[in-house]
Amino acid sequence: MPVVSLPYKYLERLCGIDRKTIIDHLPMIGSDIERILEDQVDVEFFPSRVDLYSTEGVARAMRGFLELETGEEVYPVSPSSITFSVDENLKEVRPYIGSAVIRDIQLDNEAIISLMGVQEALHWVVGRGRAKVAIGVHDLDKVTPPFRYYGAPVTRSFIPLDYDREMTLTEIMEEHPKGRDYSHIVKDKPVMPLIEDANGNVLSFPPIINGELTRVTESSKNLLLDVTGTDERAVMTALRVLCTTLITAGGRCESVTVNGVVMPDLSPALRNINVTSCNKLLGTSFSADEIATILKKMRYGAEKSGDSTVSIRIPCYRADIMHEWDVYEDVAIGAGFGNLEAELPATFATGCEHPIIALASAIRDICSGLGYLEVMPFTLSNEDVMYTRMQREPDPKALHVLHPISEEQTLVRTDLLPLLLDLLRMNKRRELPQRIFHTGDVVSSMQTYQKLALASTHPGADFSEAYATTDALMRELGISYLPAESADPAFIPGRAVDIMVDGKKMGVFGEIHPGVLNKFDIDQPVIGIEIDLHLLFPGQKETKS
């Protein structure tokens, strides 16, 4: 999770309260305090609460929680004549763009630092390191609308941020620090995404760098926002968070028309919640009026619409609200967890460590001793990573997400090795060798199982290394096994082995197939090992999902 730095003076000014009160209540709105310094406090929030990754967002939540200002904050959007055109040649490159104008904003140094902070946090949390979403903020008064978002040749040149000379797009990708960091996102594309104004001035080369021409300073009064990406929902989420942050900072929002679509849409989402369901989940006895009052503290619009129903308006920046239970969680936060009465269970029982968990703990120690680093990949994945890239048939018993928030999170993982390969892809420019492992849950047929996966990449990675690692692991665990030739299409034929224990297949190891490596865009050889831990304890029941 990114660490958010909250300067006391700016936060006190926005909240209207002293720093001690702020620090005392920060944990109550969901933050972990990392450091308390002389001029600022550094905090962490869950990645789902992207609206809290700015001083303005924290101040908005704090004012509500302390009942200094309750209910929804209204975000008016005035019409403007500013337009964006998007060229067709970006359809397979970076097709989506969101935009808005912020006028009459007063930016001091602290506000600019906060703006840069939320921009980078959104790049990390929503944008997946700018691959999915990238944000540009520009001084509108230095350019002339209408604007054009198009695919340009690599020979196009402009002066990038922090430089005083023109550079071609190729030079920027090779020489500019941001180019070296992010060029891998677009360098293999047929054209480069570029934003320019009516006079041909370049505003931005997303997702890499803005132009020096539109640098934002304390004298900037009118801002143009651009959010580009490969996922439309993520683009609009980032745009809404950015717009509401700047409105809270004192700006005034105007619309931009992008290929005929007027944006941003900052209107709230409407929903009814059931009072009985909320109380049952939380173990409370709140009335509809009490729940409405609590939700107003959490910056919802809320009114009682019946004895058992509350009508709510969900703020546009709350991209994390996907189910009624998300709202119920806010009821618990707003009421204060300390005010919820704890109850002892009616029955008493003693617990013990599950054998598979004990095995997983021992495996972590063994893998670390073998020189492998433990990683924690996401539980949610998608068909492309799980099956298509691995050259495997889809699992018909996989658990799919009914309403996925993005194309990258459409099912619960059924294997671990594909996720390790995806991590190696993301770190392929890091120093070699890379040896990683993970032991954790997978889900199939509504059952939760424990698996182990290891992966190693370097120029000399081969079958002998995979065999030696597996043999050492099984020997340390005291498990006898027999190797049998594997037909797993994720591995090179003749260089992969099934792990057989008591006549049953418990796993597989070998050299990853070049076709798989190509699909993951990995340049070096990789060996992989995957073991079903639950099969080592056939008498143990799996966990119901």
UniProtKB/Swiss-Prot annotation:
UniProt catalytic activity: tRNA(Phe) + L-phenylalanine + ATP = L-phenylalanyl-tRNA(Phe) + AMP + diphosphate + H(+)
InterPro entries named among the record's database cross-references: aa-tRNA-synth_II/BPL/LPL, B3/B4_tRNA-bd, DNA-bd_dom_put_sf, Phe-tRNA-ligase_IIc_bsu, Phe-tRNA-synth_IIc_bsu_arc_euk, Phe-tRNA_synthase-like_B3/B4, Phe_tRNA_ligase_beta2_arc, PheRS_beta_core
UniProt KW Aminoacyl-tRNA synthetase keyword: yes
Main location: cytoplasm
GO CC annotation, single: phenylalanine-tRNA ligase complex
GO molecular function, one term: RNA binding
Location(s) in or outside the cell: Cytoplasm
Pfam families (UniProt xref): B3_4, B5, tRNA_synthFbeta
GO BP term (any one): phenylalanyl-tRNA aminoacylation
Reported cofactor(s): Mg(2+)
Entry-linked PROSITE patterns: B5
Top EC class, one word: ligase
EC number, as in UniProt: 6.1.1.20
UniProt KW keywords: Aminoacyl-tRNA synthetase, ATP-binding, Cytoplasm, Ligase, Magnesium, Metal-binding, Nucleotide-binding, Protein biosynthesis
Annotated B5 domain residues: 266-342
Family to which this protein belongs: Belongs to the phenylalanyl-tRNA synthetase beta subunit family. Type 2 subfamily.
Subunit text: Tetramer of two alpha and two beta subunits.
Official protein name in the record: Phenylalanine--tRNA ligase beta subunit
